[in-house]
Amino acid sequence: MYIQVLGSAAGGGFPQWNCNCVNCKGYRDGTLKATARTQSSIALSDDGVHWILCNASPDIRAQLQAFAPMQPARALRDTGINAIVLLDSQIDHTTGLLSLREGCPHQVWCTDMVHQDLTTGFPLFNMLSHWNGGLQWNRIELEGSFVIDACPNLKFTPFPLRSAAPPYSPHRFDPHPGDNLGLMVEDTRTGGKLFYAPGLGQVDEKLLAMMHGADCLLVDGTLWEDDEMQRRGVGTRTGREMGHLAQNGPGGMLEVLDGFPRQRKVLIHINNTNPILDENSPERAEVLRRGVEVAFDGMSIEL
């Protein structure tokens, strides 16, 4: 299985266009050793030719331009994208669909709840229906697994995560299973397994068991501290309120990942306020000391 990190930042990217927090300002001033990042998205393939896009970020055009296999040039109009899987209906995971309209129709896999959001509060399916067949919905059931024809050796097993629907959603304060998903993706030829959960607010025993069965854990790296947005003066909500488990402290993501010495562990969906973006910070050093990697745009993983 080929895993390509197209974007590794949380919503807004890094540096965020309107932010002057210590990270964003430091990056622009050249006083912070850090790497710019686009908004979170990955691509998966079983042959390096046919790709499944997981989430479509607002930065999708630049992400595709930066990864040559996404333009195989086999025809006058072409793309390496053969299907799209949406893990939720967040704006920073779905807006990229608008930029892919020239390539419609697209096979889009998502849950009933995500499809409901994307036909009501943010009606992308409706909006793009006039573009050469638009978005063709394939339902993700919350039980069992599914296979996408373009990559027949990849088996996708979805699992619901405890997190909120987007602020625009008609059921923002009425959560349902299927609002947010993680994925276990297995290459049935190599046996390699990826646990992918860029929005992970809580970890229970069932999830821990799944994580133990994976070879690579690509998980939520949004915040270092739960109250980071408040500390930095750029927000009022905590990480838990937004559905993100912070890395630091008792019960934090790093403590969770300490229990997985065998697995490759990678943080993704990193917010612009997170001090681990500063490559010279003690927080970054602590992450690396504990055997955890920080995802970056263009990162490639094979399982």
Curated annotation (Swiss-Prot):
Pfam families per record: Lactamase_B_2 (PF12706)
Keyword Transport attributed: yes
InterPro entries for this protein: Metallo-B-lactamas (IPR001279), PQQ_synth_PqqB (IPR011842), RibonucZ/Hydroxyglut_hydro (IPR036866)
User: What are the GO BP annotations of this UniProt entry?
Assistant: pyrroloquinoline quinone biosynthetic process
Q: In which pathway does it act?
A: Cofactor biosynthesis; pyrroloquinoline quinone biosynthesis
Q: Which UniProt keywords apply?
A: PQQ biosynthesis, Transport
Protein purpose: May be involved in the transport of PQQ or its precursor to the periplasm.
Q: Which family does it belong to?
A: Belongs to the PqqB family.
Give the protein name, as stated in the record. Coenzyme PQQ synthesis protein B
